[in-house]
């Protein structure tokens, strides 16, 4: 018989740096999950991702207090900021441009995020990532 799902917990945790402090501890503690067990499993699974990159994770908590989790790719905005070498996007993206990314970098980010995006093909995903870049005040160069 399948286990009964008690809750879904969505968090963004720095890759390889999960620890019991907020936001992980309180969110999982409320559900009765063994926090250290999650932290060890998450850190082991995210070893291949650059340490410190915020990684979305969806944790499925079952009624017997066991859990499973699925990691997603880092948010597009974080990958774009890293590619452009900036700390934050523009407060006025239509007026103030804060950096540049090449279309090759945008395509690479789209291919990285392909598993999590709902676009029908790579070109649609590239356009979506380019739109995110423009809304952050980045210029997309050919």
Curated annotation (Swiss-Prot):
Sorted UniProt keywords: Methylation, Ribonucleoprotein, Ribosomal protein, RNA-binding, rRNA-binding
Keyword Secreted appears in the UniProt entry: no
Biological processes per GO annotation: translation
GO cellular component: cytosolic large ribosomal subunit
InterPro entries listed in its UniProt record: Ribosomal_uL11, Ribosomal_uL11_bac-typ, Ribosomal_uL11_C, Ribosomal_uL11_C_sf, Ribosomal_uL11_CS, Ribosomal_uL11_N, Ribosomal_uL11_N_sf
Record's comment on post-translational modification: One or more lysine residues are methylated.
A Pfam cross-reference name: Ribosomal_L11_N
Single GO molecular function: structural constituent of ribosome
Origin superkingdom: Bacteria
Function noted in UniProt: Forms part of the ribosomal stalk which helps the ribosome interact with GTP-bound translation factors.
Subunit structure: Part of the ribosomal stalk of the 50S ribosomal subunit. Interacts with L10 and the large rRNA to form the base of the stalk. L10 forms an elongated spine to which L12 dimers bind in a sequential fashion forming a multimeric L10(L12)X complex.
Family as reported in the entry's similarity comment: Belongs to the universal ribosomal protein uL11 family.
Protein name in UniProt: Large ribosomal subunit protein uL11
Lineage: Bacteria, Pseudomonadati, Pseudomonadota, Gammaproteobacteria, Enterobacterales
Name of the gene this protein is made from: rplK
